[in-house]
């Protein structure tokens, strides 16, 4: 340390520890306790030459990040009794026998001054630790006095320095300081500044802050002078009222402008001038916010943005399209395009002059229709309304949904009618789907059909792809270079494009009945599989040897998803048949034992109905509890009929066992005395009169595609949710509600994959022969592989905001959650209706299954891909949300 030992920074707190200091520190501790003959202990006047010295552990100011652990550093300490100062340095230079002074050390020396304000005490938590600290103020008044005085001094000096740099007037050097200060204060012009200092200004001029600080005199607190509640609140209130009046006047101006334009175009300019004169008289804002006549007259020109904002109230309830456009073809005297754009921008920027929080606050109390008008006119709200999250942005500033200001929920209907919705969650989606069914085909589909026509394959029947994504394809040339291509799977054809938006495909891979799919070796490339085609690569029976297609993905899960989907397409592909499906044969012989059938006919299957009734009676006798279905699904056929009337999936097992036995006997008996040719002819007749059950992929496909394929099956047309969910969830409701660890215990992966293949291939399934946990795993797998979420992102975020809204009552929150569920797509609504009903029954039986609502959320939320707030409140308020009174 250079200079005086007191030049170090003042100590607030210094902690010294004698722990693990060796013999010297131990003797120091003993000497301080009253031991005799120790050189580090001062005893009376006779030992003035002796000093306290030794190594101590000093607490460092630095600490480990995110930790409260104390860090101690070893320092050499000695005490000078003459000056009352405790010195310390890094080392003692090895001289322990002679007393050390600050001048005898070459290292930096720091000091601790012992004064009357210093407190020295033993640590309470650790006995081998002493604490030296200065006296700190023990009252809040002193702290506020210092804080307020210093802040005000800083603010005034900063303002004075700024005005000295920017002022253009020159003052005489002989003027007094008071005149200079007055000129500087008068040069500040800020119309939005909340009042001038008044008494505070004079008080600070008369007071010498530097003198007060040097003499350490107590300064009277200025908090009462600065924050005068009554005067400041009146000033703020007057400014807010002025802004509200100005906004209302601008709004009335725009509405009257439209009405005058529609009624009488000739008198339009006169009306605007009258309104402008009224506004200029009532406008309480400075000249920076005034609006000129040219700007308002220029707004008469046709502009999509302005006309849309003004025309929203007219077409508010009658518009079914996504956006509304109004064009004014009768406006005369149009100006140039450049002038028009400038004038419109200046008019819309009027609202952007307000602070963001004040704009939001004022707009929140407007009517729904007026809110949308100002949302289009204001440049601030254009940013918020552009991403379809207008009501969610309310929550960011208010912690309360905007719809709470509108008890009649008109604001929500206005929002849904005029917002730009995403594909899959709007009413226009079904309109587009109906148009596609009517035969509207884009250029991309035409080129795809043209690409596969050279192979002799029938054109594409669907306009939507089963799966799309980027894959790496190995080239067919000699170098075998891997190239990234965009693959599109349509029906049984796999197209690949160079770019995602290209219309012309680079090639096509046909997935016919002779195609094989295998996993490539790890030495080729990671996450790689190959597609092998037979020699008969075309239907024209032209023999052509084809090299395998090698495809690769970035992730292992994507590779497995592609392979599972392609395998299902290959197995279900029947290009040589008229329809997709599995052949089901119903015998025509009089002998019932020789029937061969996987029957889908509901009229000629009396034995199966009797067996199912017996199975239901047996299940009830075994003590299994039955539950009523939700109101919507209870209108559908019963659970047992749905199991037997669909693709042969049975909940019991009695009737299905007999059918399998008769199926085996029919092929082993040889026809019961009839000739082989007669049996062959009989089989041909049965095949010709076969009833086909369509097969389609159910996993990794959009809900709309699944339900579209499901509508082709007569026994499943009444279902409003995917068939696999209807069967599995109803089976869980009837058999697995009280199963311990339901949805938590993992089922066999092989059994889950087997169930998946059976459902997609339309095989006969006896759910009683499978583990209930495997069925739950199948349900979770279905939700996990959905390519989209069940709830839109804005609605999902809005549900969290409703949950956090502290100003809403419970009934208001229920209405908000009901609105959220009603705003999602119809398919997702029905899925949630059955799923939440099942989860509610599980929670009610938590004493048996040990599954509380917290445990359910842990295992089910990663698969549903939505906010847990929706699931929790959907279970809690199920009757109020889904049951219509």
UniProtKB/Swiss-Prot annotation:
Q: Name one GO cellular component term.
A: cytoplasm
Q: Where are the coiled-coil regions?
A: 222-249
- GO term, biological process aspect, one: small GTPase-mediated signal transduction
Domain (F-box) ranges: 348-394
Q: Does the keyword Cytoplasm apply?
A: yes
Induction field: Up-regulated by Pseudomonas aeruginosa, PAO1 strain and PA14 strain infection.
Query: Locations of Low complexity compositional bias?
Result: 168-182, 594-622, 629-648
Q: Which CDD domains match?
A: F-box_DdgacFF-like, PH, RhoGAP
Task: Could you list this entry's UniProt keywords, alphabetically sorted.
Answer: Coiled coil, Cytoplasm, GTPase activation
Query: Residue ranges of region Disordered?
Result: 168-187, 594-680
Tell me a Gene Ontology molecular-function term this record carries. Answer: GTPase activator activity
The record, for InterPro entries, names:
F-box-like_dom_sf (IPR036047), F-box_dom (IPR001810), PH-like_dom_sf (IPR011993), PH_domain (IPR001849), Rho-GAP (IPR050729), Rho_GTPase_activation_prot (IPR008936), RhoGAP_dom (IPR000198)
Instruction: Give its localization.
Output: Cytoplasm
Q: Where is this site: Arginine finger?
A: 744
Which residue range or ranges hold the Rho-GAP domain?
A: 701-885
Where's the PH domain?
464-571
Q: What does this protein do?
A: Rho GTPase-activating protein involved in the signal transduction pathway.
Mind telling me what this protein is named? Rho GTPase-activating protein gacFF
Species this chain originates from:
Dictyostelium discoideum (Social amoeba)
């Amino acid at each position: 340390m250079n200079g005086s030992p007191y030049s170090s920074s003042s100590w607030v707190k210094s902690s010294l520890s004698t722990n693990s200091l060796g013999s010297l520190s131990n003797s120091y501790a003993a000497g301080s306790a009253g031991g005799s003959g120790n050189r580090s202990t001062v005893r009376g006047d006779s030992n003035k030459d002796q000093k306290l010295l030794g190594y101590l552990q000093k607490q460092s100011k630095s600490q480990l990040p995110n930790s409260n652990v104390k860090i101690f550093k070893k320092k050499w300490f000695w005490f000078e009794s003459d000056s009352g100062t405790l010195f310390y340095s890094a080392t003692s230079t090895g001289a322990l026998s002679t007393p050390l002074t600050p001048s005898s050390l070459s290292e930096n020396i720091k000091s601790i001054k012992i004064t009357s304000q210093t407190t020295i005490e033993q640590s309470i938590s650790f006995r081998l630790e002493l604490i030296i600290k200065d006296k700190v103020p023990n009252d809040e008044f002193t702290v506020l006095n210092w804080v307020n005085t210093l802040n005000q001094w800083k603010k005034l000096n900063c303002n004075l320095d700024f005005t000295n740099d920017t002022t253009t007037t020159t003052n005489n050097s002989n003027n007094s300081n008071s005149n200079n200060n007055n000129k500087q204060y008068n040069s500040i012009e800020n119309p939005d500044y909340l009042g001038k200092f008044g008494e505070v200004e004079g008080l600070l001029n008369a007071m010498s802050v530097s003198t007060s600080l040097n003499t350490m005199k107590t300064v009277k607190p200025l908090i009462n002078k600065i924050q005068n509640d009554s005067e400041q609140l009146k000033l703020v209130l007057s400014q807010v009222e002025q802004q509200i009046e100005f906004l209302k006047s601008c709004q009335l101006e725009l509405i009257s402008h439209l009405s005058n334009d529609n009624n009488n175009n000739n008198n339009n300019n006169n009306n605007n001038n009258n309104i402008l004169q009224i506004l200029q008289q009532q406008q309480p804002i400075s000249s920076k916010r005034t609006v000129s006549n040219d700007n308002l007259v220029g707004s008469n020109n046709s502009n999509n943005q302005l006309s849309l904002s003004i025309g929203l109230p007219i077409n508010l309830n009658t518009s079914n399209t996504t956006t509304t456009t109004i064009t004014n073809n009768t406006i005369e005297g149009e100006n140039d395009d450049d002038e028009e754009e400038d004038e419109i921008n200046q008019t819309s920027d009027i609202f952007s002059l307000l602070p963001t929080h004040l704009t939001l606050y004022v707009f929140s109390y407007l009517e729904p229709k007026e809110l949308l008008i100002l949302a289009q006119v204001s440049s601030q709200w254009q940013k918020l309304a552009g991403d379809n999250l207008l009501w969610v942005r309310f929550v960011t500033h208010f912690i309360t949904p905007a719809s709470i200001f509108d008890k009649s929920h008109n604001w929500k209907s206005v929002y849904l009618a005029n917002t730009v919705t995403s594909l899959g969650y709007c009413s226009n989606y079904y309109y587009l789907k109906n148009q596609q069914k009517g035969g509207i085909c884009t250029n991309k589909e035409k080129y795809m059909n043209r690409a596969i026509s050279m192979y002799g394959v029938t054109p594409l029947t669907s306009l939507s792809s089963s799966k799309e994504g980027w894959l790496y394809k190995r080239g067919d040339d000699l170098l075998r270079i891997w190239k990234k291509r965009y693959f599109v799977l349509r029906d049984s054809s796999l197209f690949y494009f160079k770019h995602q938006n290209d219309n012309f495909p680079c090639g096509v891979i046909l997935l016919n009945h002779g195609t094989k799919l295998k996993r490539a070796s790890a030495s080729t490339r990671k996450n790689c599989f190959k597609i092998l085609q037979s020699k008969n690569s075309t239907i024209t029976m032209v023999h052509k040897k084809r090299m395998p297609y090698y495809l690769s993905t970035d992730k292992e899960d994507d590779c497995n998803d592609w392979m599972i989907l392609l395998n299902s397409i290959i197995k279900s592909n029947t290009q040589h048949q008229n329809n997709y499906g599995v052949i089901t044969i119903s015998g025509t012989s009089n002998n019932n034992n020789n029937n061969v059938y996987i029957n889908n006919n509901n009229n000629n299957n009396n034995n199966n109905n009797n067996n199912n009734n017996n199975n239901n009676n047996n299940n009830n006798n075994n003590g299994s509890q039955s539950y009523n279905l939700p109101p919507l699904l209870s209108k559908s056929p019963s659970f047992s009929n749905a199991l037997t009337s669909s693709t042969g999936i049975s909940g019991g097992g009695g009737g299905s066992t007999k059918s399998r036995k008769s199926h085996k006997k029919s092929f082993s008996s040889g026809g019961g005395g009839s000739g082989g040719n007669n049996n062959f002819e009989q089989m041909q007749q049965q095949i010709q009169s076969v009833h086909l059950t369509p097969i389609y992929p159910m996993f990794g496909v959009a809900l709309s595609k699944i339900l579209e394929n499901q509508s082709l099956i007569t026994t499943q047309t009444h279902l409003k949710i995917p068939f696999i969910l209807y069967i599995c969830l109803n089976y869980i409701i009837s058999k697995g509600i009280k199963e311990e660890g339901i949805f938590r215990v993992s089922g066999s992966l092989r059994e889950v994959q087997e169930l998946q293949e059976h459902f997609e291939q339309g095989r006969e399934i006896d759910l009683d022969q499978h583990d209930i946990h495997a069925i739950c795993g199948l349900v979770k797998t279905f939700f996990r592989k959905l390519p989209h979420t069940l709830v839109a992102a804005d609605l999902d975020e809005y549900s969290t905001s409703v949950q956090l809204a502290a100003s809403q009552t419970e009934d208001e929150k229920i209405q908000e959650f009901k609105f959220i569920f009603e705003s999602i797509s119809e398919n997702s609504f029905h899925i949630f209706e059955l799923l939440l009903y099942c989860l509610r029954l599980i929670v009610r039986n938590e004493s048996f299954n040990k599954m509380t609502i917290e445990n359910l959320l842990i295992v089910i939320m990663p698969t549903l891909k939505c906010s847990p707030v929706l699931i929790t409140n959907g279970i809690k308020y199920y009757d109020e949300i889904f049951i219509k009174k």
